Amino acid sequence: PDYSSAASDVYKRQAQIKGVNRKGDGEAIKLDNGFAGLVKLGDGALAMCTDGVGSKLLLAEQMNSIHTVGIDCVAMNTNDLICVGAEPLSFVDYVALDKPDEDLMAKIGMGLAEGCKQSNCTLSGGETAILPELVHGFDIAGTSVGYVKQDKIIDGTKISEGDVLIGLKSSGPHSNGYTLIRK
């Protein structure tokens, strides 16, 4: 199977979304690629993105490595910011659980703090929801905000023939693709 049939077709979903826009500060900056939304702010832009860890949560539970999902959640978001040239500034989290679990939340919190430290951004808030009718186990997501000067936005339009590409070996699948990896 491919990713769109195993999980969700992100690109199809994005094509279905129509934005509400304003003019001046707060006006959306259109990007054809990337996972961060940008809005004008003076000569700069606020970059924002929301992401979760997905089905890697199941693997983290099996390996008793829950603290890693906090790090992964921050990384998934801040990586989306830096891909457009934005410096990560702030992160907020959302954790939904089927029942209160102080030990689980402490481990997730330690991971979130470490992820923010590694990303050089502030952990500035969050929400914990106890939703036994909707959630079985737990889920985590977060939102990152960053800043970039508008003339420094990376959008792919300045790529040209003859540019040097640098490829780095990945240390692993990070937090993407676990739905397929587990199959």
Regions found by a protein language model. Name each.
Residues P1-A7, Y11:
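Single conserved hydrophobic/aromatic residue that forms the stacking wall/gate
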Residues Y178-K183:
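Short, compositionally biased
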